Curated annotation (Swiss-Prot):
Role according to the record: Mediates the nuclear export of encapsidated genomic RNAs (ribonucleoproteins, RNPs). Acts as an adapter between viral RNPs complexes and the nuclear export machinery of the cell. Possesses no intrinsic RNA-binding activity, but includes a C-terminal M1-binding domain. This domain is believed to allow recognition of RNPs to which the M1 protein is bound.
Gene Ontology, cellular component aspect: host cell nucleus; virion component
Organism: Influenza A virus (strain A/Equine/Tennessee/5/1986 H3N8)
UniProt subcellular location: Virion; Host nucleus
Alphabetical GO biological process terms: exit of virus from host cell nucleus through nuclear pore
SUPFAM superfamilies, A to Z: Nonstructural protein ns2, Nep, M1-binding domain (SSF101156)
InterPro entries, A to Z: Flu_NS2
Main location: virion
Domain of life per record: Viruses
Protein name, UniProt field: Nuclear export protein
Motif extent (Nuclear export signal): 9-18, 82-91
Family stated for the protein in its record: Belongs to the influenza viruses NEP family.
Quaternary assembly: Binds M1 protein. May interact with human nucleoporin RAB/HRB and exportin XPO1/CRM1.
Gene coding for it: NS
Pfam families: Flu_NS2
Amino acid sequence: NTVSSFQDILMRMSKMQLGSSSEDLNGMIIRLESLKLYRDSLGEAVMRMGDLHSLQSRNEKWREQLSQKFEEIRWLIEEVRHRLKNTENSFEQITFMQALQLLLEVEQEIRT
């Protein structure tokens, strides 16, 4: 379940944040939270309307928003990969591996 995965990863990152003064991590958490909200609202809109095409035609900014989210996801994926390479801490490694897997799932989900 991606919702619980988001919650779990955000909680783990918050714990990591306490141990460091990294602004990058803070930015990552903020973007992940924003992505979660976007994904949730997109899912609700599709379910409510029952048809993705009517959502697309109703909202011209929809495509623009979508490409912006893909940019954010790509940034997050790169950031997470970078962190993963540079950490020796197993708690952080597990957290970033989970985050990477989740981001790839969400990217695939939004794409389809």
